[in-house]
Swiss-Prot record:
Belongs to the cytochrome b family. Heme b b562 binds at H83, H182. Binds 2 heme b groups non-covalently. One of its GO terms (cellular component) is respiratory chain complex III. Heme b b566 binds at H97, H196. The lineage of its organism: Eukaryota, Metazoa, Chordata, Craniata, Vertebrata. This is Cytochrome b. Pfam families: Cytochrom_B_C (PF00032), Cytochrome_B (PF00033). A ubiquinone binds at H201. Its cofactor is heme b. Component of the ubiquinol-cytochrome c reductase complex (complex III or cytochrome b-c1 complex) that is part of the mitochondrial respiratory chain. The b-c1 complex mediates electron transfer from ubiquinol to cytochrome c. Contributes to the generation of a proton gradient across the mitochondrial membrane that is then used for ATP synthesis. The gene is MT-CYB. It comes from Lama glama. The chain crosses the membrane at residues 33-53, 77-98, 113-133, 178-198, 226-246, 288-308, 320-340, 347-367.
Amino acid sequence: MTNIRKSHPLLKIVNNAFIDLPAPSNISSWWNFGSLLGICLIMQIMTGLFLAMHYTSDTTTAFSSVAHICRDVNYGWIIRYLHANGASMFFICLYIHVGRGLYYGSYAFLETWNIGIILLFTVMATAFMGYVLPWGQMSFWGATVITNLLSAIPYVGTTLVEWIWGGFSVDKATLTRFFAFHFILPFVIAALAGVHLLFLHETGSNNPTGISSDMDKIPFHPYYTIKDILGALLLILTLLLLVLFSPDLLGDPDNYTPANPLNTPPHIKPEWYFLFAYAILRSIPNKLGGVLALVLSILILALIPLLHTSKQRSMMFRPISQCLFWTLVADLLTLTWIGGQPVEPPFIMIGQVASILYFSLILILMPVAGIIENHILKW
């Protein structure tokens, strides 16, 4: 008799995705982050649901409703901080996941890669709208500045911004619709993640060597389920350390001041995970140019499969490309630092150099390195 997990219509899907799935025998801990992202998403949806039970999306009561959650709701403080810091953990896992894909050439799976880019944009949009909801100073001014960027679009820009605002400034209508979108988008993300996984399982996972591992596959369970549980425990431990010992470490003190349209904070900046893109935006002294650079800083990922010039898929045996990859990582960390600094010398120049280097590395230096490494192979 066939095992029920292989015959039952629902269990069969779970079995083929998480139990009997053939996986390469040599995938390292860098492959843990997909499952960690799934855990982050489930955790964010659960904590978000409980927060939504007590939150009110009205400009007069939003700030006090968040204070009420922290003070009066049973364990409201931990739910709120798990949700806020859970977003940070989500982005750490997300950036490592993308970095892994870049390093090991996982972008050769085109459908999986492109759905991943759509997922990245959706998660960024969700996080941005979530940051607006507590209705503190940085929430309000962040929403004002970022939505205003759309006014740089020729002809339709101003109309588009007012349409998003639901009025002539960021106000009650904006907050209500941002709450609605912030609630629905995680479910869109979950659906997209399902499609992401569907396309991945069409080809099977990549591995550190970038060579086909069809002749050496092992079942996902128990090998990688155990490995994923270890990763999950480390993720939860890190998150709990953050939430219980320093919940406001990654937040902005300005967001503990209620939103005031008449008082602009001295430094408007987004959460830390958007600072690299914000630094690229600010490094161009033209509004439309800055907005284009901001969008392209993420959209450039879609070009990476086209820019792959090497005969080898992975960077595992390509030292020049490895150096450039880690230079890119250092450059992104530099941009993150610059994004949090005021717009004054020497930070302006550092930001401009780092932005140029970011695009140069991806568009020029890495493809050239691939060609050079191909020639080295002939020696």
